[in-house]
Regions:
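Alpha-helix initiation/capping motif
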Residues: 17, 26, 56, 65, ...
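Single conserved hydrophobic/aromatic residue that forms the stacking wall/gate
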Residues: 1-3, 162-171
Length: 171
């Protein structure tokens, strides 16, 4: 895919890692590809990229942790950085918790959260308050012995058909 032809100036790649780091890089930074590839994000040891989205720099971002919390902030709270930068803290995570999902909310949509024990919850985006980046967030779904940890968060519309299944087991 040739990024230079597909996206105009003013677009960004917004990335989030499991350790709560976020990064916004101008899309033009990826227009000159090399045969050995390009580094998009410098990761700490043990950290992984959980999500990336192409944005216009004026959107909102929602980050969900496996502890059941969510934080919502303006994308403009994160400055644009070069390709090799590490990024900034998007969400403060307690010891042992990880980020599981990043969403760029659309107006009128809802968030469907699912727990490890099969519980689900559908919540309007307007129910999540907007804060500055770097906080611990608010409870999206209670994470306890009954529910288990949060395992997924996706954006859905009123007419969305949802199918959830457990992973297949090898025989």
């Amino acid at each position: 895919m040739c990024i230079r032809d597909r996206y105009t100036e003013g677009h960004f790649i917004f990335m989030a890692t499991a350790n709560g780091t976020v990064k916004k890089t101008p899309l033009e930074s990826f227009s000159r590809q090399r045969s050995v590839g390009l580094i998009a994000l410098e990761l700490d040891e043990g950290d992984v990229l959980i999500s990336a989205a192409i944005t216009d720099g004026e959107r909102e971002v929602m980050l969900f942790s496996d502890g059941g919390k969510v934080t919502r902030f303006k994308e403009s709270d994160v400055r644009a950085m070069g390709r090799t930068a590490r990024g900034v803290r998007g969400m403060r995570l307690p010891e042992g918790q990880k980020l599981i999902s990043m969403l760029i909310p659309e107006e009128g949509s809802q968030i469907l959260t699912a727990s490890a024990r099969g519980y689900g919850k559908r919540t309007a985006i307007t129910e999540f308050p907007e804060y500055k980046r770097g906080g611990q967030g608010v409870i999206a779904m209670v994470s306890n012995d009954r529910n288990g940890r949060l395992v997924g968060a996706v954006q859905v519309l009123d007419l969305s058909l949802i199918h959830i299944s457990e992973p297949t087991r090898p025989y």
